[in-house]
């Protein structure tokens, strides 16, 4: 798999389109950190770490809905393996005039765009969520 974050975002997007309550994805530290930000910002209910029958780590994600509609309306990958996107703290864009969130991988960890601005740190813009 060339893009594990992109794969996870696609699984979430597809599961919400089908109305699923949970979705599982192979586990990794970076994926868990991205899910931490999504949970902190209120886009998912949470996630649980487990292992499959072969002993590989798995993340079981609990999706969130409001009045039957998915909370996540748009989920876009920004920085891709073929084209990395790095931005300084002043260049990190606001998503939909501040209604959405950019998830940024910084030297201080993976965080939302608002946290990156408050910590005065830039980094790789992984994805945007609205």
UniProtKB/Swiss-Prot annotation:
Q: Does the keyword Ribonucleoprotein apply?
A: yes
**What domain of life does the native source organism fall in?**
Bacteria
Provide this UniProt record's keywords sorted from A to Z.
Answer: Ribonucleoprotein, Ribosomal protein, RNA-binding, rRNA-binding
Q: Which cellular component terms (GO) are annotated to the entry?
A: ribonucleoprotein complex; ribosome
Q: Name one GO molecular function term.
A: rRNA binding
An individual GO BP term: translation
Do you know which InterPro entries this protein is assigned to? Ribosomal_uS8, Ribosomal_uS8_CS, Ribosomal_uS8_sf
Q: Which family does it belong to?
A: Belongs to the universal ribosomal protein uS8 family.
Query: What is the stated purpose of this protein?
Result: One of the primary rRNA binding proteins, it binds directly to 16S rRNA central domain where it helps coordinate assembly of the platform of the 30S subunit.
How does this chain assemble? Part of the 30S ribosomal subunit. Contacts proteins S5 and S12.
The protein, known as: Small ribosomal subunit protein uS8
């Amino acid at each position: 798999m060339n893009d594990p974050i992109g794969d996870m975002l696609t699984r979430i997007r597809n599961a919400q389109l089908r109305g699923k309550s949970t979705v599982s994805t192979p586990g990794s530290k970076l994926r868990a950190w991205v899910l931490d930000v999504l949970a902190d910002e209120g886009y998912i209910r949470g996630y649980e770490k487990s292992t499959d029958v072969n002993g590989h780590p798995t993340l079981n994600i609990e999706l969130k809905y409001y009045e039957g509609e998915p909370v996540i309306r748009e989920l876009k990958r920004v920085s891709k393996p073929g084209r990395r996107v790095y931005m300084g703290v002043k260049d990190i864009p606001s998503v939909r005039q501040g209604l959405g969130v950019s998830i940024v991988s910084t030297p201080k960890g993976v965080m939302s765009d608002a946290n990156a601005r408050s910590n005065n740190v830039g980094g790789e813009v992984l994805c945007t969520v609205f």
